[in-house]
Amino acid sequence: MDKPKSFAYIIFCLTFCLAFAVGSNYFINTITQSNMIYNSREPHKIGATYMTYNNTFYSVVNEEISKVVKEHGDQLITLDPAMSLKKQKEQIQYLMDQQVDALVITPVDYEGLKDLLKVVYKKNIPVIIVDTEVKQNKYVSYSIVSDNYDAGVQCAKDMMTKLDHANIVLLQHSTTRSGYLRIKGFEDTIQSNPNYKVIKRMECEGQLEVAMPKMESFIQEGKDFDVVMCLNDPSAMGAMAALSANNMLDGKFVYGIDGTPEAKEMVEEGKMAATVAQSPKTFGKKAG
């Protein structure tokens, strides 16, 4: 059965808007099922559950999706699992119970949604994955992600132009595909050069309020370090807050990824080494 043009067009617009937000480094993986869109011209409901709403990146993505949805007279239901896989599963089930016509998901866990995505797939509900992938891509209609590996590579290359040696602290979020790839890209780039050493790894869920005390605790260990490589800008903000509180921000190189306005301002002020930019507006427009 062919997709009716009405809702198929909305899905296309969502997907295009999201991908446009990513900028030049995005991939759209289309595994489109021919019977996935309801044959109806009635208003539709789109459900969205992000990894966390405590990140301006996702709030901007949601704003762009909302614009597209409203333009077509449809409804957007946005939920925040607050980094909890259990909550995200409950939210996806809730959205199915609300009979949504499509789902936009930023997964909390790379592998944790397998069984539920299979259920969604069997219900013929299109799924758009945004920003970070899931392992079970066969149940997904569209994946819109930036080149997370290359983002880590770019951070490493910038660091290597500024420092000929460094002791490095990693703030990571290993259970998400995007977080894993960003750190892997960074580490792979420095791997062959013994002048760059990773001396500490800390899981922070990409959250400022987790990264800050983790960084504070590490500072109290008294170890010498030069660079803090962070999987995203919120964790970089947490690291810088801890460094600033200990009068250690000067001379330290803090890297982030996302290109949030706050991070860009920190870079301009010389407080942050760099942030690799993504465009959440593009993500949102393509998902919309």
Which stretches of residues belong to each language-model region?
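Flexible loop/hinge segments that line or gate small-molecule binding clefts
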Residues: Y110-D150, T161, T260-E268, M272-A273
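Hydrophobic membrane-insertion alpha-helices, especially the h-region
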Residues: I10-N25
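Structural motif
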Residues: I77-Q99, R201-G222, A236-M237
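Flexible loop/turn connectors
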Residues: M248-G288
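Hydrophobic alpha-helical
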Residues: P107-Y121, F186, E205-E265
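An alpha-beta-alpha
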Residues: I65, V153-Y196, K200-R201
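Extracytoplasmic "Venus flytrap"
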Residues: K45-E64, V68, H72, I77-K89, ...
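Hydrophobic alpha-helical segments within soluble ligand-binding/sensing domains
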Residues: I144-A166, V210-M212, T260-A263, S279-G288
